[in-house]
Swiss-Prot record:
Signal peptide boundaries: none
Family statement drawn from the similarity comment of this UniProt entry: Belongs to the UPF0473 family.
Superkingdom, natural source: Bacteria
Entry protein name: UPF0473 protein LVIS_1220
Natural source organism: Levilactobacillus brevis (strain ATCC 367 / BCRC 12310 / CIP 105137 / JCM 1170 / LMG 11437 / NCIMB 947 / NCTC 947)
HAMAP family listed in its UniProt record: UPF0473
PANTHER family tied to this protein: UPF0473 PROTEIN CBO2561/CLC_2432, UPF0473 PROTEIN CBO2561_CLC_2432
């Protein structure tokens, strides 16, 4: 893992906090949104990871996300686009391509 890895904390409906590493963020002109892909912090490079994707709040900068409520991706069209971007990213072998999920 990159020691300078950006991290965020997600808080669930019960107030439990969990730390995540940011895999990457990107913008989609087609959907007019920005997205963030994350995975649980503390995973070693050879461990399978559960990659999660969310839409960023409308006023958040994808180059420097500042927080707020992440939005669930709800449409199949958006998921297809996010998965395509993720697969392109994974093609360079950075993370196991069999690890992604829609959770």
């Amino acid at each position: 893992m990159n020691e300078d890895q950006e991290q965020i904390t997600l808080v669930d409906e019960n107030g439990n906090e969990e730390l995540y590493d940011v895999l990457f963020t990107f913008e989609s002109d087609d959907f007019g949104k920005s997205y963030i892909l994350i995975y649980p912090a503390g995973k070693s490079d050879d461990e399978e990871v559960d990659i999660q994707a969310y839409a960023l709040p409308a006023d958040d900068d994808p180059a420097n996300p500042s927080g707020g409520d992440l939005q669930l991706i709800e449409s199949d069209e958006e998921w297809d686009m996010v998965e395509s971007v993720l697969n392109t990213f994974l093609a360079d072998g950075t993370i196991d391509p069999n690890a992604g999920s829609k959770d």
